[in-house]
């Protein structure tokens, strides 16, 4: 397939708008899909030590599932609920490779955070006793936040579009990652604008006792498909 286009940053509004239009076609089923994935993530998160790594890996399959049903909604106006698990039936190996990369990034992030905290606040025993200087705690916290942000941005740049490209275009992992990176690097303005809008929507969704997230979360899960369509086909 062709390489991604460079588009105006203002197209980010179209990506959010396209996701909203898709959501309105079958809101109930999409909310149900998001709730199911949420329950799965909560269950995985309760597994000691490896829960976070499994969440990072499975999220790729969730994004692929939403990309697939987004295409079904766009073309047919509906989807079968079981199609949210399409990634476990098709292109499973390729998605698993991307998921494994996500798990490794999560592991590196966690280990680096521990090293930063221990290195800046002293030995573990003093940390356990909370015998810490306020400035040290703040410095450690800011360092961890900065590291997590950098790793998150880099990982997202390489993988944001990869699940859609794998499940919809049968792209191999290496090329899917390359195309995702090209899409990001050629549309940094749009990526930043889109991220800010998604963050704002998430915050707004939290206001009414988190009930707004029932709408916001499944809608945001459709955004990667909207970006994929705009960058590669318009």
Regions found by a protein language model. Give the residues of each.
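Hydrophobic alpha-helical membrane segments
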Residues: 1-234
């Amino acid at each position: 397939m062709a390489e991604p286009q460079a588009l105006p940053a203002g197209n980010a509004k179209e990506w959010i708008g396209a996701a909203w239009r898709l959501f309105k076609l079958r809101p109930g089923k999409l909310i149900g899909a998001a709730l199911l994935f949420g329950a799965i993530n909560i269950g995985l998160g309760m597994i000691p030590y490896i829960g976070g790594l499994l969440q990072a890996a499975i999220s790729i399959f969730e994004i692929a599932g939403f990309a697939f049903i987004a295409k079904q909604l766009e073309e047919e106006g509906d989807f079968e609920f079981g199609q949210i698990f399409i990634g476990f039936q098709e292109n499973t190996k390729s998605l698993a490779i991307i998921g494994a990369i996500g798990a490794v990034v999560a592991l590196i992030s966690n280990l680096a955070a521990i090293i930063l905290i221990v290195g800046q606040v002293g030995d573990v025993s003093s940390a356990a006793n909370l015998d810490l200087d306020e400035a040290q705690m703040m410095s450690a916290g800011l360092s961890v936040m900065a590291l997590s942000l950098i790793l998150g941005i880099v990982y997202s740049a390489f993988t944001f579009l990869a699940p859609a490209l794998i499940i919809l275009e049968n792209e191999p992992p290496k090329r899917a990652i390359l195309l995702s990176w090209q899409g990001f690097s050629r549309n940094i303005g749009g990526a930043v604008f889109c991220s800010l809008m998604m963050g704002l929507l998430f915050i707004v969704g939290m206001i009414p006792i988190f009930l707004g997230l029932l709408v916001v979360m499944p809608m945001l899960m459709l955004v990667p498909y909207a970006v994929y369509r705009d960058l590669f086909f318009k």
